[in-house]
């Protein structure tokens, strides 16, 4: 009798994706984050669904409905804390996942990489509209500041901003539509994840050496299912530690106050995972220039495959490129720190220098490091 998982039309898809999938034998723990992102997505959809059952998307009751969830709903505090901190874990895994792709040259699978960038943008959009829903001070003013950036677009900007708001300012209509967007986007993300995996399984996974691994493959199960389970254990442990012991440590204290359009907080800032882009936005004194820099900081990922100049795929054997990569990582951490500071010296100049270095590293220094490696390989030692 033939095995059901190899004959049943539905089981066959699961089998080819997670059980009998030929995987490179040498992929490291950095390859765990793809599956962890899948788990994060499931956690966010489930906790979000239960929150949506009790949340009301009205300016008068949104804030109190979130308080009601935490006080009166059975384990509502836990669901809310898991959802809020789950977003932080999601972005942590996401940035590591992108960083791994950048380091090991996975971006040369262009379709997979491009869908990944679209996924990143969609997740960022989802997180932004989700942050507005509790209708606290930072929710309201964050929504006002970021959506107001649309008005920087010449000619159609103001009309576009008012179209998004559903009025002349962020109000009831904005909150209602943001809730609708926040509900539908995770399902769009799920569809994009399937497309992402479809393209990945066309070429197969990359590996740390960057060499074609076709001659040495092992089945995904049990080797990588066990490895992923270990990663999952660490993820859940970290998430539960965050959600149970310090659930508000990554949030903003201003969000404990209900939204008040007449009182502007002294320092408007988004969640920590957007601070690097926010710092780049603020580093340019011109509104339109800042918006373009903000977009470029993310969309630059789309041109990375065309900036690859080295003969070797991975950075594993390219020490100069490795050094630049870790400088870029440190630079992004610096930008994240600057994004959370007040707009005053010395933070302004640090932010401007870090923003210049960010684009300089990706557009100029890293391609030059690849060419330098090619030149060194050609020398007869």
From Swiss-Prot:
Keywords: Electron transport, Heme, Iron, Membrane, Metal-binding, Mitochondrion, Mitochondrion inner membrane, Respiratory chain, Transmembrane, Transmembrane helix, Transport, Ubiquinone. GO terms for cellular component: mitochondrial inner membrane; respiratory chain complex III. InterPro entries: Cyt_b/b6_C, Cyt_b/b6_C_sf, Cyt_b/b6_N, Cytb/b6-like_sf, Cytochrome_b, Cytochrome_b_C_euk/bac, Cytochrome_b_N_euk/bac, Di-haem_cyt_TM. It comes from the Eukaryota. It is a multi-pass membrane protein. Heme b b566 binds at residues 97, 196. Its main location: mitochondrion. One of its GO terms (biological process) is mitochondrial electron transport, ubiquinol to cytochrome c. It is found in: Mitochondrion inner membrane. A ubiquinone binds at residue 201. CDD domains: cytochrome_b_C, Cytochrome_b_N. Gene3D superfamilies: Cytochrome Bc1 Complex, Chain C. One of its GO terms (molecular function) is ubiquinol-cytochrome-c reductase activity. Its cofactor is heme b. Pfam families: Cytochrom_B_C, Cytochrome_B. The cytochrome bc1 complex contains 11 subunits: 3 respiratory subunits (MT-CYB, CYC1 and UQCRFS1), 2 core proteins (UQCRC1 and UQCRC2) and 6 low-molecular weight proteins (UQCRH/QCR6, UQCRB/QCR7, UQCRQ/QCR8, UQCR10/QCR9, UQCR11/QCR10 and a cleavage product of UQCRFS1). This cytochrome bc1 complex then forms a dimer. Belongs to the cytochrome b family. Component of the ubiquinol-cytochrome c reductase complex (complex III or cytochrome b-c1 complex) that is part of the mitochondrial respiratory chain. The b-c1 complex mediates electron transfer from ubiquinol to cytochrome c. Contributes to the generation of a proton gradient across the mitochondrial membrane that is then used for ATP synthesis. Heme 1 (or BL or b562) is low-potential and absorbs at about 562 nm, and heme 2 (or BH or b566) is high-potential and absorbs at about 566 nm. PANTHER family: CYTOCHROME B. This is Cytochrome b. The gene is MT-CYB.
């Amino acid at each position: 009798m033939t095995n059901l998982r190899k004959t049943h039309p539905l089981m066959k898809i699961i089998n080819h994706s997670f059980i009998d999938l030929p995987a490179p034998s040498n992929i490291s723990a950095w390859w765990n984050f793809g599956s962890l992102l899948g788990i994060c997505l499931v956690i966010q959809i489930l906790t979000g669904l239960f929150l949506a059952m009790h949340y009301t998307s009205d300016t008068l009751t949104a804030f109190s409905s979130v308080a009601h969830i935490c006080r009166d709903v059975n384990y509502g505090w836990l669901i809310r804390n898991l959802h809020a901190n789950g977003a932080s874990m999601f972005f942590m895994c996401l940035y590591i996942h992108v960083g791994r792709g950048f380091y090991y040259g996975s971006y040369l699978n262009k379709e997979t990489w491009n869908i990944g960038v679209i996924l990143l943008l969609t997740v960022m959009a989802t997180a932004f509209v989700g942050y507005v829903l509790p209708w606290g001070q930072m929710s309201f003013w964050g929504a006002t500041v970021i959506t107001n950036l649309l008005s920087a677009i010449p000619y159609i900007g103001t009309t576009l901003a008012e179209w998004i708001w559903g009025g002349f300012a962020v109000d009831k209509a904005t909150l209602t539509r943001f809730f609708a967007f926040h509900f539908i986007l995770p399902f769009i993300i799920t569809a994009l994840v399937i497309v992402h995996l479809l393209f990945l399984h066309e070429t197969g996974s990359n590996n740390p050496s960057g060499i074609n691994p076709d001659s040495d493959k092992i089945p995904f199960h049990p080797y990588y299912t066990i490895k992923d389970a270990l990663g999952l254990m660490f993820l859940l442990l970290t998430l539960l530690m965050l959600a149970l012991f310090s659930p508000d440590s990554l949030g903003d204290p201003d969000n404990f106050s209900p939204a008040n359009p007449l009182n502007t907080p002294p320092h408007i800032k988004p969640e920590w995972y957007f601070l690097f882009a926010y710092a780049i936005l603020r580093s340019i004194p011109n509104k339109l220039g800042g918006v373009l820099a903000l977009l470029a900081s993310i969309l630059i990922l789309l041109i990375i495959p065309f900036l690859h100049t080295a003969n070797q795929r991975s950075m594993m054997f390219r020490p100069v490129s490795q050094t630049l990569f870790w400088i870029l990582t440190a630079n992004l951490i610096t930008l994240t720190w600057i994004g959370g500071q007040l707009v005053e010296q010395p933070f302004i100049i640090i932010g401007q220098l870090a923003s210049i270095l960010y684009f300089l590293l990706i557009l100029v220094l890293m391609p030059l490091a690849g060419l330098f490696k090619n030149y060194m390989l050609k020398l007869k030692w």
